[in-house]
Amino acid sequence: MAHKKGQGSTQNNRDSIGRRLGVKKFGGEFVRAGNIIIRQRGTATHPGNNVGIGRDHTIFALVDGFVKFERKDKDRKKVSVYPAA
């Protein structure tokens, strides 16, 4: 005889919902001031020209223009927005 009641399989059936992180506007895409370019945890990508960074490391455009992904140095990336000429 069992001393404990068997555990149901529903105990394991949980998962957290996705956080909707990632790139929202890609290279070459036109953005307006205030548009979110990247949602991220930590600074995987750093802010470049005409780009701001929020409390939660969200990168957003400060001016209207085109998104450009660049290298900051050997092992860091940055994203900039360049106004249309």
From Swiss-Prot:
Entries under InterPro entries matching the protein: Ribosomal_bL27 (IPR001684), Ribosomal_bL27_CS (IPR018261)
Bridged cysteine pairs (disulfide): none
Alphabetized PROSITE patterns for the sequence: RIBOSOMAL_L27
One GO cellular component term noted in the UniProt record for this chain: cytosolic large ribosomal subunit
Signal peptide: none
Alphabetized Pfam families for the sequence: Ribosomal_L27
Annotated SUPFAM superfamilies: Ribosomal L27 protein-like
Keyword Transcription attributed: no
GO molecular function, one term: structural constituent of ribosome
Top-rank taxon: Bacteria
A biological-process GO annotation: translation
Keyword Ribonucleoprotein: yes
Keywords, comma-separated and alphabetical: Ribonucleoprotein, Ribosomal protein
NCBIfam families per record: L27 (TIGR00062)
HAMAP family: Ribosomal_bL27
Protein family according to the UniProt entry: Belongs to the bacterial ribosomal protein bL27 family.
The protein's name in its UniProt record: Large ribosomal subunit protein bL27
Organism from which the protein derives: Campylobacter fetus subsp. fetus (strain 82-40)
